[in-house]
């Protein structure tokens, strides 16, 4: 049977209880098995790094996923939903280095690669377990015992297989290129891994002396002085105009400079020149005949072996000088220009960011620390035109936050540029939510994509499966572990991580020995193969053929250049199509002011702290309802508290009828809604219709992943329609006899609505839904599904839908609100009855609504009658005051104006308005008996209310409240005041609903006493008093005695338990 619940919503206790129930009943496994015959849905979880505690962003991400997957499950989808874990790469290595106190790769080498690998593995596995428990605490249901983990050999093989496909399709390339490089981690990093932030760097203008011309210089600008020792060329734009001009200083010294014509003034200003003379102008293409000297040739001997020239490039812009310093070893554009013209790829910098011996006098110095040294050397050689600083957005390593540099190194690349057009076609074949996530943001990223550098010079990652012969240099790509064991002639098993796999050699046809190249995969390549790796492909095709590609994925908008992109690229290589059918892109979590959360700002909020304070369901409901999924979430604690209050209201809504239902032994299995259909009131039919409308709205919202609209719809319905309206309407019906059909109808309707709402909230607030389901449904129907999450999603019952009734109730509620506003103006509280409400409807629909819901209106306005005027008609008891306009009267009547104004004020307003309408004028008799004619512009009109009434506007039209009191109304008003206070005292004594009491009331005001005595029986019935003593000299006693001030009348009341 239905049981009472606690008065207070206790999230911690409920969630502990429900978690235990789920574990004891094996609810997740059974729920998934329950849907095995349903339509398949393949979901791929974007794997978080196993680096520690979950944060608000990862919590929001998993809550979005869980809510959508629960919704799909209830719609009979059989879901493959393995959680994923990214367990390799710099994110893990940097954490382990921190634990071990390491500062560089040298420390790792000294420690031992094998030891380091084992530490990384141990760390990743330990953190995975901790994070699993944290996600489970959020109420997230996934196949937690069977996750996919990137460190497993079966997963590694999926990456190997994909690379072999690239090799076979001629999409794999090895070569020297200038790449993003982290000097602390000593590895290449991808474009998508570069994080940009504000940084102040040197800003210098440098003079390169032109060979064969006296005192003539090309002027370049750079923010990286440390790259000057690697300069090999200058780039200019072929179509820009350049000038050779004499620049003169105040002391009379002069130099001949070359720069873009448009930028001469900037160069003069930077160099503090006072005058200039243009000697010659030419297009950029005419400068290519020039050669120049390195400004640091005496310090960097290798510079003297290079022929420095001017080359054309479209990437040059009209900024600073229009001449760009080119160092192919330290920039992608520079490298490409150098490769085009076969320029030397000078890169005198090592992997740790320090100059090599090739840098001459700078050897051994860290490049960033060398900036001021280079500047001083340029100054000493009179090659520094100007120096300053610039604050700009500069790239940093995504994991250790070290400023990146560009280094020309040998790397492995996927030739994305060769499949880019097909990738763009596949983007159009995917359903994107919102649409612009694919059609704009993602498309733009892919259009600008370069070949993907997939190699990293690190340790803890998937080893690149390329074996190279030491003797002949032949390369071989291995696709699986079995293939490697066979070619190596090994029996048994090996682990596919470094350094174990590095020990495996493969014989070469030339008689030499092939060893694995040392690089590991870019960690984004790990997760790129998730959709087939999680299906255990290529070991077996069974699951792959049944499930692939993914039906749905969702991640943050940063993944347009991360996981969305890497998956698409790898899948195009492996299968020639996108690995997903639909993608939901969500936003970032920010603080309330819109700033990124960071420890340095002290604005980080832990989801676990929020759960500890408010519970998981509150956090879930908040992040889901706060904004559209693709908008950034500005986390606001006050809004969390508001949602928590809403859930408390939801709890109280559920709790409200339970004591009465339990007391009456109400059994919804015995009393159906059909059996009480004839006893249904209009408000019952309305709430049934509203519940169906909510189901429809939530379904529509979920079809477009508008989770915020879905959750808001449910909470608004609970708060506005159930709590603030329907429950207020039916409250008196719950106090009647147990077998009263009217009461049973209210019970059945509430039960029906509660069952619907319990199912609707289950994807979003799974703990609360389960708690209510077990009490409301499982307790009365043992044949019902074991968990709410096994239930089918509610379908719209068209038989209950009545949109006309919903519109009518909206009208009625507007009238009630207007009546309440009018009561306040009249100073009459709602507890006090009034004789009538008058409504002047502005439409036939409004009039019909009033007639249809007359009893609801009378009840909710506490009025004895509802009076309707005709549609568009004014209330006939209204007066119409005439307000003369002296400004219009004065010019016409001049001296007589003083007589006209008071005479006009006395005229009947209705008669005057009628005359104006019919004749366009009115003959006014003045005090002296003379008459004048007045016209419409001379008078304004103002409605006046009868004495004791007040009005307010509603959607239906004006509403008037007659607040005049009769003795009968006053008696009822005082009686209601007494009832309210006695009920408060019952609550204070914590009495059960049906417990009878003895009441004593003393009222010394004889007039009020007589009024209250007339309704003694009503008061006794309402407060369940079988003994009720009232009088001016009554001895008030009992278990609780209180003095009250009731509308200025002193009263003493006592309650005694029976």
UniProtKB/Swiss-Prot annotation:
Supply the Pfam families for this chain. Anticodon_1, DUF5915, tRNA-synt_1
The short motif 'KMSKS' region is annotated over 596-600
Arranged from A to Z, the UniProt key words for this protein are: Aminoacyl-tRNA synthetase, ATP-binding, Cytoplasm, Ligase, Metal-binding, Nucleotide-binding, Protein biosynthesis, Zinc
**EC assignment:** 6.1.1.5
Entry's localization field: Cytoplasm
Query: Entry's InterPro entries?
Result: aa-tRNA-synth_I_CS, aa-tRNA-synth_Ia, Anticodon_Ile_ABEc, Ile-tRNA-ligase, Ile-tRNA-ligase_type2, M/V/L/I-tRNA-synth_anticd-bd, Rossmann-like_a/b/a_fold, tRNAsynth_Ia_anticodon-bd
The domain of life is Archaea
List ligand-binding residues for ATP: 599
Biological process annotations from GO:
isoleucyl-tRNA aminoacylation
Enzyme class, one word? Answer: ligase
| Catalysed reactions listed for this entry | tRNA(Ile) + L-isoleucine + ATP = L-isoleucyl-tRNA(Ile) + AMP + diphosphate
Cofactor needs: Zn(2+)
Record keyword Protein biosynthesis present: yes
What GO cellular component is one of the record's annotations? cytoplasm
- Motif 'HIGH' region: where in chain: 48-58
The protein's GO terms of the molecular function aspect are:
aminoacyl-tRNA deacylase activity; ATP binding; isoleucine-tRNA ligase activity; tRNA binding; zinc ion binding
Subunit relationships: Monomer.
Q: Which family does it belong to?
A: Belongs to the class-I aminoacyl-tRNA synthetase family. IleS type 2 subfamily.
According to its UniProt entry, the function of this protein is described as: Catalyzes the attachment of isoleucine to tRNA(Ile). As IleRS can inadvertently accommodate and process structurally similar amino acids such as valine, to avoid such errors it has two additional distinct tRNA(Ile)-dependent editing activities. One activity is designated as 'pretransfer' editing and involves the hydrolysis of activated Val-AMP. The other activity is designated 'posttransfer' editing and involves deacylation of mischarged Val-tRNA(Ile).
In the record's own words, the domains note is: IleRS has two distinct active sites: one for aminoacylation and one for editing. The misactivated valine is translocated from the active site to the editing site, which sterically excludes the correctly activated isoleucine. The single editing site contains two valyl binding pockets, one specific for each substrate (Val-AMP or Val-tRNA(Ile)).
Name under which the protein is recorded: Isoleucine--tRNA ligase
Upper lineage is:
Archaea, Methanobacteriati, Methanobacteriota, Stenosarchaea group, Methanomicrobia
